[in-house]
Amino acid sequence: MMRGGMGNMQKMLKQMQKMQKEMQKAQEELAEKTVEGTAGGGMVTVVANGHKQILEVKIKEEVVDPDDIEMLQDLILAATNDALKKADELANEMMGQFTKGLNIPGLF
């Protein structure tokens, strides 16, 4: 009975190591993937990667009004929040396969 138990433990350990490598690969892929958040009908675009790092902010010239800086700030904020939401969704999609069936709040 002990021998069967040890064999199962080794098998489980190998499965965990495989899953850990797959998770690490998925994390690396997340860093490479990008998402775009937009606001103002595409007047402001924010690009982020799957790790929620902002990589680029694009602002169309026609939206820049020195007399209405507040509107531009609002558009940048909205586009940034949109990009971060999409980055979260991407991470959940990619990493969710590893946590499927586990009920750990806030993991992914």
Swiss-Prot record:
Basic and acidic residues bias spans: 19-32
GO MF annotations, alphabetized: DNA binding
Keyword annotations from UniProtKB, A to Z: Cytoplasm, DNA-binding
Locations listed in the record: Cytoplasm, Nucleoid
Region annotated Disordered, chain positions: 1-32
Superkingdom to which the source organism belongs: Bacteria
Gene3D superfamilies to which the protein is assigned, alphabetical: Nucleoid-associated protein YbaB-like domain
InterPro entries named among the record's database cross-references: YbaB-like_sf, YbaB/EbfC
Biased composition (Low complexity): 9-18
Alphabetical list of SUPFAM superfamilies matching this protein: YbaB-like
GO CC aspect terms: bacterial nucleoid; cytosol
Keyword Aminoacyl-tRNA synthetase: no
Family that this chain belongs to: Belongs to the YbaB/EbfC family.
UniProt function note: Binds to DNA and alters its conformation. May be involved in regulation of gene expression, nucleoid organization and DNA protection.
Subunit details: Homodimer.
Listed name of the protein: Nucleoid-associated protein GK0018
